[in-house]
Amino acid sequence: MSHDWTDNRKNLMLFAGRAHPELAEQVAKELDVHVTSQDAREFANGEIFVRFHESVRGCDAFVLQSCPAPVNRWLMEQLIMIDALKRGSAKRITAVMPFYPYARQDKKHRGREPISARLIADLLKTAGADRIVTVDLHTDQIQGFFDGPVDHMRGQNLLTGYIRDNYPDGNMVVVSPDSGRVRIAEKWADALGGVPLAFIHKTRDPRVPNQVVSNRVVGDVAGRTCVLIDDMIDTGGTIAGAVALLHNDGAGDVIIAATHGVLSDPAAQRLASCGAREVIVTNTLPIGEDKRFPQLTVLSIAPLLASTIRAVFENGSVTGLFDGDA
């Protein structure tokens, strides 16, 4: 790739935290740039130190950090990197967050609870971020929490493209894991050729994390290949329960597709044994060998992130990269 797109009046610099170096290198390769060298380490008490090895004055900085477990460690590292760039006189700082942490805490379910997703946005702004690039937020309203531009990218085109190429049979139905994601499921159904929809009616106890009671399937899934979608898979309990419900209703193959593979224990074991034909996620988060299983397919989100970074750098349109809301 040439540097024809580079605006000589500015200097694009890519910075990466230590949480997901493989993704950072993939993005750098797509952009034909290098990840800026830095010294990042912990002191004995766990405090994080970061120093960049070259001048950042006047640069257009993109700070890439995923937030797998331990989430707070990697989030704090990104905040410290942003602060260092601000104090080093970077011209503009964009926080590239493939997976936005604390996104499930986007509203108060009961009294005396925090809205942690808003707090994260405030912390990023205070640290010095001018802009956020992220992928498939848990809810769209989080875009409004940040006082600045938010480029909310979608993994849908990547995932639906893979499904179209590998499952050409038209006898398919898109299944939303709950009624709240039906609008997104409609977009999936259109992308897969106008296939029908179904959804899982479920209840959740807000006092018990990672626990959902799946009740019944609404829609006709008998004999069909079911594409069960979600934004993330954490412990896998919800999605595994949904697979069982679909099979009980006579579904054929069940394909699970989600953007974020959090895969907290015991997700790998649950997904491997739940009866799904394939589990498709992207690499917004690192997925170690201990979390992999035969049915798992991991697609690279790097081309989408790189295209977004390039568009932001050129002050171009991000909306043209996908059919979304950026």
Swiss-Prot record:
Modes of activity regulation: Activated by inorganic phosphate, and to a lesser extent by sulfate ions. In addition to form a complex with ATP, Mg(2+) also acts as a cofactor. Strongly inhibited by ADP and GDP through competitive binding at the activation site and at a specific allosteric site. Competitively inhibited by Ca(2+), Cu(2+) and Fe(2+).
GO cellular component: cytoplasm; peptidoglycan-based cell wall; plasma membrane; ribose phosphate diphosphokinase complex
Alphabetical UniProt keywords: Allosteric enzyme, ATP-binding, Cell wall biogenesis/degradation, Cytoplasm, Isopeptide bond, Kinase, Magnesium, Manganese, Metal-binding, Nucleotide biosynthesis, Nucleotide-binding, Transferase, Ubl conjugation
PROSITE patterns membership: PRPP_SYNTHASE
UniProt-annotated binding residues for Mg(2+) 2: D178
Entry similarity comment: Belongs to the ribose-phosphate pyrophosphokinase family. Class I subfamily.
Task of the protein: Involved in the biosynthesis of the central metabolite phospho-alpha-D-ribosyl-1-pyrophosphate (PRPP) and of the decaprenylphosphoryl-arabinose (DPA), an essential precursor for the mycobacterial cell wall biosynthesis. Catalyzes the transfer of pyrophosphoryl group from ATP to 1-hydroxyl of ribose-5-phosphate (Rib-5-P) to yield phosphoribosyl diphosphate (PRPP) and AMP. It can also use GTP, CTP and UTP as diphosphoryl donors.
HAMAP family per UniProt: RibP_PPkinase_B
Protein name per its UniProtKB record: Ribose-phosphate pyrophosphokinase
Organism annotation: Mycobacterium tuberculosis (strain ATCC 25618 / H37Rv)
This protein's encoding gene: prs
